[in-house]
Curated annotation (Swiss-Prot):
This is ATP phosphoribosyltransferase. GO terms for molecular function: ATP binding; ATP phosphoribosyltransferase activity. It is found in: Cytoplasm. It holds the Pfam family HisG. Pathway: Amino-acid biosynthesis; L-histidine biosynthesis; L-histidine from 5-phospho-alpha-D-ribose 1-diphosphate: step 1/9. SUPFAM superfamilies: Periplasmic binding protein-like II. It comes from Listeria welshimeri serovar 6b (strain ATCC 35897 / DSM 20650 / CCUG 15529 / CIP 8149 / NCTC 11857 / SLCC 5334 / V8). Belongs to the ATP phosphoribosyltransferase family. Short subfamily. It is an enzyme of class 2 (transferase). The keyword Glycosyltransferase applies. Catalyzes the condensation of ATP and 5-phosphoribose 1-diphosphate to form N'-(5'-phosphoribosyl)-ATP (PR-ATP). Has a crucial role in the pathway because the rate of histidine biosynthesis seems to be controlled primarily by regulation of HisG enzymatic activity.
Amino acid sequence: MKALKIALTKGRLERDAVALLKKAGIDCSSMLDKKRKLIFHSNSQPVSFILVKAVDVMTYVKHGVADIGIVGKDVLMEASKSHYEMLDLEIGKCQFCLASTPDFDPSNYRRKIIATKYPTVASKFFREKGEDVEIIKIEGSVEIAPVLGLADAIIDIVETGSTLKENGLLIYEKMYPISARLIVNKASLKQNKTQIFQLIDQLEQAIKEERTK
């Protein structure tokens, strides 16, 4: 039986994903002693894991290097769809929010400058509102953009809001909820349908158990 290759997002989402996979009965023991390794093979099940950055999960899945990926909905919303989004894993929960300084006027967005790491998401949001804004893409810490006068407001993902508070920003609009999703390569789903749906069934059961805690 061919081993399923699963691409995981490095960092906190990786830890949450591994915990959920373990609960679903997937052998993740090879990842206990990671050191600098990025590829891991199970000794007891036909499964292997690849650790990559969030934005690269989709690339590995798209090109079939990974059969399955676990990545945040924020990454999926920003990129073109070239996969099947199969399951909301209900981990890594946060939210897209619009935030700015206390003197910001949210009643009129006309010609406002919005800084964000997610220009596609921001464009969609303001298009739905019928607002004409200028969107600036920033790769680093967007929180300082309104403080330094680069932008009138920001759009970013928010979990607790502590970083915004530390930089003197307030949340003015809560936009889209985010959580980690299971995505599958289109060709892999045809070739490994039984294996993949078995994994999905196991994960769904684990998610249900988490809900009842």
